[in-house]
């Protein structure tokens, strides 16, 4: 799989789950994002499908009994998203910058960027352990996102006739994130 396709693949997975269960892409993406903290991608998808399936068949109360590999609070958010009428409510429920950005990347918001400790290290230009990554407050988060957006713009301008012509900020983040983890042997 092309690294650049990471979020497009996530979008297709969310669309497939949405179609199978008669919900919107945004709702499926919201559930996936809600269940993502400390959850491997493959398990995240299994958990999202299970919650959505049980919710569709038996409702919120039964969906609360589904086992997931993330925090109980995040399962609560996933169910709230299933009960939520609009995309704006989904973002309010998700609440955090990183998890909301992950949701936006899945649904294809071009300038959304999911900033975690690895993305910070890439931006900072030095490998830091996660315990040495500072708290990424609102202002710093916005600065890092702005720099990823600018990097995408520079690459689009430089590569207007090649494969970078339509590069998004979230693709720059995904490419650098996966490459960084591979170069540094980071598996978790």
Question: Where is each model-derived feature located?
Answer:
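HhH-family (HhH-GPD) DNA N-glycosylase catalytic core used in base-excision repair
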Residues: 4-188
């Amino acid at each position: 799989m092309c690294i650049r396709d990471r979020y497009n693949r996530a979008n297709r997975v969310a669309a497939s789950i949405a179609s199978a269960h008669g919900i919107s892409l945004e709702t499926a993406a919201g559930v996936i994002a809600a269940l993502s903290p400390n959850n491997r991608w493959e398990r995240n998808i299994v958990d999202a499908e299970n919650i959505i399936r049980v919710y569709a068949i038996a409702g919120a109360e039964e969906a609360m009994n589904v086992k997931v590999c993330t925090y109980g609070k995040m399962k609560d958010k996933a169910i709230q998203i299933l009960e939520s009428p609009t995309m704006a409510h989904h973002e309010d429920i998700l609440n955090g910058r990183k998890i909301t950005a992950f949701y936006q990347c899945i649904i294809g918001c071009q300038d959304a960027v999911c900033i975690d400790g690895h993305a910070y290290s890439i931006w900072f230009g030095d490998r830091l352990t996660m315990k040495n990554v500072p708290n990424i407050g609102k202002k710093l988060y916005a600065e890092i996102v702005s720099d990823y957006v600018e990097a995408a713009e520079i690459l689009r301008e430089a590569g207007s006739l090649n494969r970078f012509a339509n590069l998004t900020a979230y693709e720059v983040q995904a490419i650098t994130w996966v490459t960084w983890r591979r170069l540094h042997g980071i598996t978790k």
